[in-house]
């Protein structure tokens, strides 16, 4: 089973493009084959990182992946060799990765041999923290499980759920401040970031991180709201509508942007991740887009043929059992299976026919069965012997 692309890059579902790009650069440097010659494990990690970045750096692919998982992007993501480079990653990512190889990772170093490329493509450090200062702290993602019947999965369904999550505080309107007043953070002086400078034999390195005092916001609260203790969020309950497409499977999930926990002090809300769980069906067995129904038929009906009523996911339908039907025969009812996730009709229902053998019979039925047993036409060995004889053996039997 493929690893989640967000886990591969070590980012969350609410991460923006800059966070994803930064994580990709760091991992690309860490697992690059030039830094790990002959290391097959590092090579595999490098391919996984490239594949994940190709999807998550593309808005359309990321949207489909968030909604349907790996099934949503299909073969569009690289399967090992090409990765982000083959998928069209911009040159700034490539040059930045090489820059990191020369400078020791994610930190910036003065006098980088690739500084010109970095400036040309907007790869300068520090922007991420400043952007966080203007947008606040993101809320966390929320994951729930949604149980579905096979009937609901077959055609898709709309579900309305009540979800407990962090919501903006009504008293302070999510600001976390009792009066609404804020002041410039004394630690970062409003930049939302702090810098740590270290000197090595290779030069001076500057590591930039979000300010721990204000969380990257650049401002702090003067007087905290007593209802939410300055967080700007409280536990609440909201109602969400979920449009479940036909054809989902166990473990498939849908990401609902901005429906997760609200961010502290006005920060953007995280995502709601709905994981689908198929309820075991007592009548049908699922096989991909098809369903299987086991039907027991009496011996006379198997021999003579009959019409029976069988259940489907859409209601009962009439089914013809042809004369001479053999046990384990699969009869198809077209279009009564599971809808395809990406559209294009539904699968089929297969009816597996078997002989019904009663455990107890009446005296009269026993006598009838004894008479039937005497018939050579009902003896499987007689049929087998007859079919296995050669032409000359059959001719000899006729004239002897």
From Swiss-Prot:
Alphabetical keyword list: Chaperone, Cytoplasm, DNA replication, Metal-binding, Repeat, Stress response, Zinc, Zinc-finger
Record flagged with keyword Zinc: yes
Cofactor requirements of the protein: Zn(2+)
SUPFAM superfamilies membership: Chaperone J-domain, DnaJ/Hsp40 cysteine-rich domain, HSP40/DnaJ peptide-binding domain
Residue windows of the CXXCXGXG motif repeats: 169-176, 185-192, 211-218, 225-232
GO molecular function, one term: ATP binding
Amino-acid positions noted as binding Zn(2+) 2 in the UniProt annotation, renumbered to this chain: 185, 188, 211, 214
Cysteine-cysteine disulfides: none
Pfam families: DnaJ (PF00226), DnaJ_C (PF01556), DnaJ_CXXCXGXG (PF00684)
Residue intervals of every CR-type zinc finger in the record: 156-237
Domain J stretches: 4-69
Transmembrane portions of the chain: none
GO BP field: chaperone cofactor-dependent protein refolding; DNA replication; protein refolding; response to heat
GO cellular component term, pick one: cytoplasm
Domain of life of the organism encoding this protein: Bacteria
Keyword Nucleotidyltransferase tagged: no
Comment text on domains: The J domain is necessary and sufficient to stimulate DnaK ATPase activity. Zinc center 1 plays an important role in the autonomous, DnaK-independent chaperone activity of DnaJ. Zinc center 2 is essential for interaction with DnaK and for DnaJ activity.
Family in the record: Belongs to the DnaJ family.
UniProt function note: Participates actively in the response to hyperosmotic and heat shock by preventing the aggregation of stress-denatured proteins and by disaggregating proteins, also in an autonomous, DnaK-independent fashion. Unfolded proteins bind initially to DnaJ; upon interaction with the DnaJ-bound protein, DnaK hydrolyzes its bound ATP, resulting in the formation of a stable complex. GrpE releases ADP from DnaK; ATP binding to DnaK triggers the release of the substrate protein, thus completing the reaction cycle.
Subunit note: Homodimer.
Protein name in UniProt: Chaperone protein DnaJ
């Amino acid at each position: 089973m493929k690893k989640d692309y967000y886990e591969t890059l070590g980012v969350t579902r609410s991460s923006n493009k800059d966070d994803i790009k930064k994580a990709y650069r760091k991992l690309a440097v860490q697992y690059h084959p030039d830094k790990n010659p002959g290391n097959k494990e590092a090579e595999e990690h490098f391919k996984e990182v490239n594949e994940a970045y190709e999807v998550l750096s593309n808005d359309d692919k990321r949207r489909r992946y968030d909604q349907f998982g790996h099934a949503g992007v299909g073969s569009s993501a690289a399967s090992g060799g090409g990765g982000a480079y083959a998928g069209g990653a911009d040159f700034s990512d490539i040059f930045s990765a090489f820059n990191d190889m020369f400078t020791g990772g994610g930190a910036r170093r003065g006098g980088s041999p690739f500084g010109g490329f970095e400036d040309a493509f907007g790869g300068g450090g520090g922007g991420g923290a400043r952007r966080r200062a203007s947008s606040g702290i993101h809320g966390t993602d929320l994951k729930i499980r949604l149980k579905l019947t096979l009937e609901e999965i077959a055609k898709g369904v709309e579900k309305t759920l009540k979800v407990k999550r962090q919501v903006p505080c009504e008293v302070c309107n999510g600001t976390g401040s009792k009066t609404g007043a804020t002041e410039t953070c004394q630690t970062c002086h409003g930049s939302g970031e702090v810098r740590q400078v270290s000197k090595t034999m290779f030069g001076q390195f500057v590591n930039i991180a979000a300010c721990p005092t204000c969380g990257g916001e650049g401002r702090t609260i003067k007087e905290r709201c007593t209802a939410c203790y300055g967080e700007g969020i409280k536990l609440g309950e909201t109602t969400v509508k979920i449009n479940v497409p036909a054809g989902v499977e166990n473990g498939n999930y849908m990401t609902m942007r901005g429906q997760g926990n609200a961010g502290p002090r006005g920060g953007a809300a995280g995502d709601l991740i709905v994981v689908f769980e198929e309820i075991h069906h007592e009548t049908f067995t699922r096989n991909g887009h098809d369903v299987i129904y086991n039907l027991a038929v009496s011996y006379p009906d198997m021999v003579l043929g009959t019409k029976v009523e069988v259940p489907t996911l859409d209601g009962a339908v009439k089914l013809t059992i042809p004369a001479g039907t053999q046990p384990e025969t699969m009869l198809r009812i077209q279009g009564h299976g599971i809808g395809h996730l990406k559209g294009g009709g539904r699968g089929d229902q297969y009816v597996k026919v078997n002989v019904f053998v009663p455990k107890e019979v009446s005296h009269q039925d026993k006598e009838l069965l004894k008479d039937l047993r005497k018939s050579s036409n009902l003896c499987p060995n007689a049929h087998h012997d007859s079919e296995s004889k050669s032409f000359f053996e059959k001719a000899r039997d006729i004239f002897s």
